[in-house]
Each structure stands twice: as structure tokens, then as C-alpha cells.
């Protein structure tokens, strides 16, 4: 037989001659997912349906011709195939009946096997039940025997007033373990009476074991710890460590604490709460030394935790019920002392547990009674009281904004000049002071620090605003207030790094991470920026005040120079006018009085702005005066020309007498030169002052221009 792929290729090749004439792709018919609808949809744009039909007819003829050629080429194979199919049905019928019989036999065997499996499972289940019943009967027999044996042992060896021997308790404990084991396997066969009897025996054994435990504790204090060790081992054997802890709490801890913890004992204690805690801690050294040596300080007897489950449980319950006055937060100072004393007490318990490992400390911290005890201390209320005390005292210094005594005198180097800053520093320092700060409320105290600085910042803004008011009337001047503000802000800004270190020392150890340090540094930087923003505002206000003192009336006196020199026959000016000194006097006084407080750099910045502003106004006035003088001079020249009938004017350049206009120009030059020289004495270059170079050039040029025209 030929390869099917080859035949398909042969059929396709047979229609190749017509492929070039077709209006569709003949390969579409060879696809496995060929669809007539899709074929018609793709060829909907054919020239016409008639042409599509004709092309399909041509393609069909080509396929038929190719198929005939294929049959002719492989004729022998086709004939053999037909011959082989003759009698095939008869052969199939011949093998069909044996196969069906074989299937029937297999199904019957499957059914037989299933029946046997079911029967076997039933027998195994019956055997299991019998075995379980047998074991139950055996356990029941053991239970009866052990009950009698244990009862006899308790009656003979453990009851009565005679001392209990450890060996008898150990035998009884083993019998009880065996009894509990067999009880579990025959529980459904036991009568209620026997179940009650087992419970009764267990309770009796624990009572005798409890008595032996108390005797062993007494003997251990007398240097005989062997009985205590055997007793603890019996508790471990019975898996009753909690019973030992309960017995110790009720029989040893509770009687002692009854006489120690109470409101009356607290009132009668000379040392107050610290004395109560000292007595509570003394119990450990008095009654728990040997017990802790065996259970806490070694792994010899695992499973016991007498410190938490016996000692601390009883102490915490009594503190909450019989001494709840210690939790009252009404008086912040008393609350702080009690809370710190309590934290020290809890810390000593943790220190005791540290010997057993971190797991014991964690168990103590996460214990429900520890959580309950810590929750009783109302720290939010305590902080609120501290907040009212600290913030209230600070706020009292800020209202009203400016008081008669806001500016202090005779202060030390560590004090601020303004009382509001002293109050702010005191408030921030008090947040971290001993007797106020508690690590558990660190975020709240830190937030209060930030609030104090921001509130002070708001007060500074209000103080600057009031200093600009027209009704300012205080024992101190505006300048004194602003300069004190400037100095105190810089001093407080320099104090922030010291405050940052104080906060880092106060933060709880577990929170003092690199992330916290970065956040704290960023926060302090923001506070420094907030304070620093006021420095610019203060300098601007000082500039405005100085300009008001120097400029308004003094600069206008330049306009009086023409009136002073015209037709007055004054001498040629050689000294500067008085207004120059009047403009300079406030600048010199400001530099002399405030350089030590503000610093040379700040004073120079303020004076430079003031001098620049004055010089600009001075430049404008001088320019107007020179222009006016020039116009007046030209008007007089034209008038003389008219009177002389147009004849050439007589030159005055050779005259020894200086004109009034020239005297005005000379006076302006003397004044400007003096202004410039005095500014240089204040350590200013001409280029540092706006319009000073232009002003100097303008008066010099006016003189030169006059000389040239002459």
C-alpha cells in the first residue's frame, strides 16, 4: 500500500493544472476543520456565484481524474484488498462466542471473590470486637484488683497521723497510673459506682501527696531536700504539675500574702508600697529557695513554674482585689512613685526568671494575669494629668502675648531673655524629667515636646505682629523685643541637639533603632526650620523699623538745599549737611547696641538692607534736586540772553565767585561723599549698597558737567 501522504499529494498534484484558473484557494479543502459556511464567507467577494460554481466544477473534474490515475497506478493493491475482505464476517462470528464465554467466567470469579472478601471482613471485625472485649474484660479485672490494692494501700500506709513515706506514695502513684490506664480501655463496662470509686481514690491520693509535699517543703528548709525531690518526681509521674503549683499557692503562698497585701498593711507600711513589695519578694528567699533550685535553676524536674503559676498568680490577684488604691491616677506624683516602684518589682521577678531562659520570661510577660495587672495602670489618664500640668503652666506664660514682664533682666547665660522661651524650655525638659516621664507613654511625651515648640512658634508670630502695631506701649522698645526674640530663637535652635540626645536616652531600648534615630533627626530638623523661619521675619521687621527712623524726614531735607543757597550769599560748602548725620545716627546706634546680641553678620545684613533702601530714596531725591537746579540755571541763562538782545553771554568760568547752583551741587557732593565714607566705616563696600555707586557718580558728573560747560 502506498503512503497516504503520498496519495494526498498525488491527488493535489492532479488538480495543479487547474489551480491557476481557480478563484479560491484549493488548500482550504485539505484543512481538518474545513467548513462550508466559512469557505463561502471567505469567497463572498468572488466575481460571481456562477464563476465560483464553474471553478468548483473544474476542481472536481481534476480530483476525479487524479483518483482514476491513482487507482490505475495501484490496481493490484486495490484487488488484493477486496479479496482479503471476503469471509471476514464469518471469522468474526467464529471468535465472538469464546470471548463472550470468557467474559462470563471472569465476572463470576469477580463475584465469588467479592463474596469471600465481604465474609472475611465480617469475620475480622468480629475477631477485633472479641479481642477488644477480651482486653476490656482483662482491663476490668485489673481495675477491680487495682482498686482494692490501692484502697488497701491508702488505708494501711497513707491514712492516719503517722508520717507518710515517699515509697508508699510512689507505689500508690504507680497503681493510680495503672488504674487510669485500664479504666480507659474498659470505661464502658464500668459501673457508675466503680467510676466514682476511682475518682475518690485519685482525690485521696492527691490529698496525701499534698500533705507530703508540704512536709517535704518544711524538711527542705532544714537541709533535707530528698523528700522534696521524690515528691516532685511523683507529681511528674502523675502528670500533675499543675496540682503541685495549686497546692503550693493555696497552702504556702496564700497564708503568707494574706498578712502582707492589703489596704491596712499599705497604710501602716513605713516605706509605703516599696515596703510591701519588699516583703512580697522576701517570700521567695524564705519559702522558695529549694523549690526554685530544683525546678527553675536546673532541668532536673521540668514542667513546673512555681514563680508564675503559684507565686505571681496569688500576688497579682491580691494586689487587684485587696490593694486597688495603688492604681488610682489622681495625683500624678504619687502615681509615678507607685508605678516606678511596681516596674522595679516586676523587673526583679523577670530577673529571677531569666535564669531559666528567655522562654520563661516571655511566658511571664504574656501571662493573662500579667496583662491584666498592666492594664489596671491607667497610663493615658496619668499622661493627661501631666499634660494639663505642663501645658497649662506653659500656656499661662503665653497669654496675653506681650506682658509687662515678658522681657527679663539680670539673667544668667543659661536663661532666655523672654519668659515664653524659658517656659518652653522648662516644659520640654520636664517631659523627660525623673518623676514625670514613663517609657510606656514615650510617644505621647514626644508629641507634647513637638506641640510645645509649635505653640511657641505661633506665639512668636503673634509677638512680631503686635510689635508692628501702632499702639505698642511696653516698658521695652520694639527693637529690644525683636532683638531678644532673635537671640532666644537662635539659642533654642542650638538647644535642639541637646534635647535630641535627651530623647534618645529616654526612649525604650527596644524602640531605639536606626529607623527611629533617623525619624527623630528629621523631626528635629523640621522644628529647627520652623524656628529659623522666624529669624528672617524678625530681620525684615527690624529693617522696616530702622528705615522708618532713618529715612522719611531726613531724606526730604535734601529738597531744602536750593532754598538755603539761592540768594543767601552762603560760603562754599565744606561740611556735610545735618540730615546726613541724622540718617546715620540710628544705623550707628543699632550696630553699637545690638552687635553683641545679634552677631556681626546679622547686623551687617540688616544695616545693608536699610542703607540700600535709604540710598535708593536718597538717589531719587538728589536726582530731582539736580534736575531742578539744571532747569533753573537754563531758565536764567535764557532770560539773560533775552535781556541782552541775543548777544553772547558773558562767560562766568573765569569769575572767582561761585554761583548758587554750583554751591548746591558742591553741597550735594559733600553730603554724598560723607554718606559713603560713613557707610565704609560700618564695613560696607560701595558695591554692597544699592544705588550708592550711581549716586556718587551722579553728583560727581554734575560738577564735571558744569566745569566743562564753563
Swiss-Prot record:
Cellular compartments per GO CC: Golgi membrane; Golgi transport complex
Keywords: Golgi apparatus, Membrane, Protein transport, Transport
InterPro entries: COG2, COG_complex_COG2_C, COG_su2_N
Major localization class: Golgi
Compartment annotation: Golgi apparatus membrane
Entry membrane topology: Peripheral membrane protein
Coiled coil: none
GO biological process, one term: intra-Golgi vesicle-mediated transport
Family: Belongs to the COG2 family.
Summary of the function given for this chain in its UniProt record: Required for normal Golgi morphology and function.
Subunit structure: Component of the conserved oligomeric Golgi complex which is composed of eight different subunits and is required for normal Golgi morphology and localization.
Name of protein: Conserved oligomeric Golgi complex subunit 2
Organism: Drosophila melanogaster
Lineage start: Eukaryota, Metazoa, Ecdysozoa, Arthropoda, Hexapoda
Amino acid at each position: 500500500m502506498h503512503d497516504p501522504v503520498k496519495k494526498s499529494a498525488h491527488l493535489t498534484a492532479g488538480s495543479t493544472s487547474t489551480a491557476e484558473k481557480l478563484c479560491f484557494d484549493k488548500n482550504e479543502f485539505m484543512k481538518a476543520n474545513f467548513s462550508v459556511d466559512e469557505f463561502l464567507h471567505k469567497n463572498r467577494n468572488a466575481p460571481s456565484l456562477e464563476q465560483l460554481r464553474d471553478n468548483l466544477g473544474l476542481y472536481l473534474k481534476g480530483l476525479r481524474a487524479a483518483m482514476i490515475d491513482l487507482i490505475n497506478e495501484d490496481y493490484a493493491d486495490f484487488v488484493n484488498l477486496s479479496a482479503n475482505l471476503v469471509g471476514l464476517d464469518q471469522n468474526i462470528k467464529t471468535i465472538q462466542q469464546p470471548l463472550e464465554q470468557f467474559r462470563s467466567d471472569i465476572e463470576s470469579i469477580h463475584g465469588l471473590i467479592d463474596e469471600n472478601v465481604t465474609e472475611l471482613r465480617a469475620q475480622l471485625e468480629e475477631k477485633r470486637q472479641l479481642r477488644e472485649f477480651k482486653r476490656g474484660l482483662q482491663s476490668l479485672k485489673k481495675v477491680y484488683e487495682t482498686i482494692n490494692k490501692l484502697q488497701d494501700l491508702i488505708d494501711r500506709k497513707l491514712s492516719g497521723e503517722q508520717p507518710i513515706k515517699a515509697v508508699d506514695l510512689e507505689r500508690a502513684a504507680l497503681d493510680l497510673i495503672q488504674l487510669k490506664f485500664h479504666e480507659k480501655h474498659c470505661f464502658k463496662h464500668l459501673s457508675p459506682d466503680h467510676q466514682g470509686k476511682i475518682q475518690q481514690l485519685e482525690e485521696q491520693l492527691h490529698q496525701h501527696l499534698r500533705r507530703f509535699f508540704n512536709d517535704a517543703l518544711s524538711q527542705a528548709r532544714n537541709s533535707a531536700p530528698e523528700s522534696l525531690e521524690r515528691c516532685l518526681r511523683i507529681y511528674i509521674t502523675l502528670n500533675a504539675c499543675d496540682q503541685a503549683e495549686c497546692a503550693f499557692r493555696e497552702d504556702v503562698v496564700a497564708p503568707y500574702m494574706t498578712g502582707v497585701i492589703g489596704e491596712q498593711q499599705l497604710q501602716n507600711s513605713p516605706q509605703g508600697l516599696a515596703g510591701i513589695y519588699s516583703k512580697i519578694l522576701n517570700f521567695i528567699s524564705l519559702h522558695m529557695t529549694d523549690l526554685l533550685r530544683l525546678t527553675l535553676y536546673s532541668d532536673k524536674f521540668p514542667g513546673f513554674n512555681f514563680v508564675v503559676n503559684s507565686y505571681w498568680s496569688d500576688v497579682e490577684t491580691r494586689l487587684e482585689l485587696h490593694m486597688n488604691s495603688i492604681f488610682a491616677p489622681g495625683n500624678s506624683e504619687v502615681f509615678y512613685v507607685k508605678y516606678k516602684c511596681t516596674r522595679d518589682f516586676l523587673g526583679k521577678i523577670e530577673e529571677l526568671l531569666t535564669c531559666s531562659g528567655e522562654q520563661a520570661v516571655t511566658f511571664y510577660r504574656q501571662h493573662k494575669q500579667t496583662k491584666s495587672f498592666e492594664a489596671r495602670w491607667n497610663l493615658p489618664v496619668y499622661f493627661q494629668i501631666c499634660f494639663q500640668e505642663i501645658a497649662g503652666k506653659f500656656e499661662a506664660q503665653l497669654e496675653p502675648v506681650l506682658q509687662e514682664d515678658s522681657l527679663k533682666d539680670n539673667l544668667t547665660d543659661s536663661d532666655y531673655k523672654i519668659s515664653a522661651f524659658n517656659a518652653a524650655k522648662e516644659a520640654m525638659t520636664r517631659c523627660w524629667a525623673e518623676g514625670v516621664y514613663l517609657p510606656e507613654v514615650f510617644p505621647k511625651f514626644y508629641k507634647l515636646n513637638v506641640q510645645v515648640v509649635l505653640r511657641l512658634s505661633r506665639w512668636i508670630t503673634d509677638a512680631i505682629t503686635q510689635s508692628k502695631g501702632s499702639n505698642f506701649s511696653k516698658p521695652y522698645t520694639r527693637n529690644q523685643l525683636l532683638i531678644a526674640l532673635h537671640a532666644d530663637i537662635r539659642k533654642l535652635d542650638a538647644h535642639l541637639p541637646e534635647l535630641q540626645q535627651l530623647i534618645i536616652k529616654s526612649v525604650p531600648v527596644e524602640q531605639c533603632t536606626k529607623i527611629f534615630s533617623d525619624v527623630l533627626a528629621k523631626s528635629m530638623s523640621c522644628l529647627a526650620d520652623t524656628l529659623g523661619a522666624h529669624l528672617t521675619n524678625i530681620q525684615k521687621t527690624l529693617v522696616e523699623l530702622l528705615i522708618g527712623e532713618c529715612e522719611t524726614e531726613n531724606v526730604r531735607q535734601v529738597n531744602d538745599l536750593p532754598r538755603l543757597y539761592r540768594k543767601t550769599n552762603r560760603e562754599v560748602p565744606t561740611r556735610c549737611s545735618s540730615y546726613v548725620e541724622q540718617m546715620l545716627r540710628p544705623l550707628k546706634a543699632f550696630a553699637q547696641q545690638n552687635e553683641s546680641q545679634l552677631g556681626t553678620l546679622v547686623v551687617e545684613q540688616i544695616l545693608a538692607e536699610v542703607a540700600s533702601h535709604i540710598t535708593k530714596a536718597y538717589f531719587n531725591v538728589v536726582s530731582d534736586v539736580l534736575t531742578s537746579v539744571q532747569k533753573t540755571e537754563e531758565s536764567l541763562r535764557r532770560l539773560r540772553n533775552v535781556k541782552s538782545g541775543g548777544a553772547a553771554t558773558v562767560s562766568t568760568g573765569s569769575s572767582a565767585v561761585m554761583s548758587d547752583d554750583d554751591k548746591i551741587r558742591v553741597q550735594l557732593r559733600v553730603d554724598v561723599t560723607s554718606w559713603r565714607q560713613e557707610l565704609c566705616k560700618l564695613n560696607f563696600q560701595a558695591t554692597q549698597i544699592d544705588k550708592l555707586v550711581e549716586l556718587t557718580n551722579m553728583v560727581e558728573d554734575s560738577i564735571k558737567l558744569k566745569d566743562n560747560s564753563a
